[in-house]
Regions:
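Active-site flanking residues adjacent to catalytic metal/cofactor-binding acidic residues
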Residues: 44-47, 70, 106-108, 146, ...
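Phosphate-binding and adjacent anionic-ligand microenvironments
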Residues: 101-102, 140-216
């Protein structure tokens, strides 16, 4: 370790503007007014993780009538944190009870998103990236990147749009590096992780939410 003496110690700075910077980039990627005009009824399950606060802000900015569950970012997970069907029964039931148009489930660090349809049915995580790619390709032509464990749905969607998919080894960093090298317009992993370089070279459930609502 390199130790600093008392004169050269670093300083701790608190940045409270992270949500605003992040959400500004997300909102720039979609048509806020078009989404708001539809007045979507949304249930958001943030599993008491990091996505609760910015997730609720995003839905508010997009004019959604949102019901938030497990939205206290204590880190004490309300259910098993993996956003798979067996762990999202509360979300599915809430969508049905409230007559919501869609339900969204974030994982604890908010880089993955699972979707529940208007009937309370769980949509597999593989569909998150596929649906995001479908929307992006309809507006922007360019390559995509996905790891080798991701469904071929993205290949079929890309082919229909006349676009190419670059495959990478498993690992978010490998996908992100390929996207930056190939100037990809969308990318991610089949676990519900979508990467949009307009927001940043990382998986992000917030851009996923915005794109899915724009697609609806």
């Amino acid at each position: 370790f390199n130790y600093a003496d008392s004169v050269n110690c670093g300083k701790v700075a608190i940045n409270t503007g992270g949500d605003a910077v992040h959400l500004k980039r997300v909102l720039a990627c979609v048509n806020k007014n078009q989404i708001a005009a539809k007045k979507f009824r949304v249930v958001l399950d943030s599993v008491n993780g990091a996505g609760a606060r910015p997730g609720k802000k995003l839905l508010s900015y997009l004019g959604c009538r949102a019901t938030a569950i497990n939205d206290m970012p204590t880190g004490l997970f309300a259910h098993k944190p993996e956003p798979i069907a067996e762990n999202l029964t509360q979300l599915c039931d809430m969508v049905k009870r409230t007559g919501a148009d869609v339900g969204f489930a974030q994982d604890p660090d908010a880089d993955r998103l699972a979707i529940v349809d208007e009937k309370g049915g769980y949509i597999g995580e593989e569909y998150t990236l596929a649906l995001a790619a479908k929307y992006v390709f309809s507006h922007t032509k360019g390559p995509a990147a996905a790891n080798l464990s991701t469904s071929r749905m993205i290949d079929d969607i890309a082919a229909a749009a006349g676009c190419e998919v670059f495959r990478t080894p498993v690992g978010e960093v490998n996908v992100a590096q390929a996207m930056m090298q190939k100037n990809c317009v969308i990318g991610g992993e089949g676990n519900g992780g979508v990467i949009d370089l307009r927001v940043g070279p990382v998986r992000d459930s917030l851009i996923s939410i915005a794109i899915i609502l724009q697609l609806c």
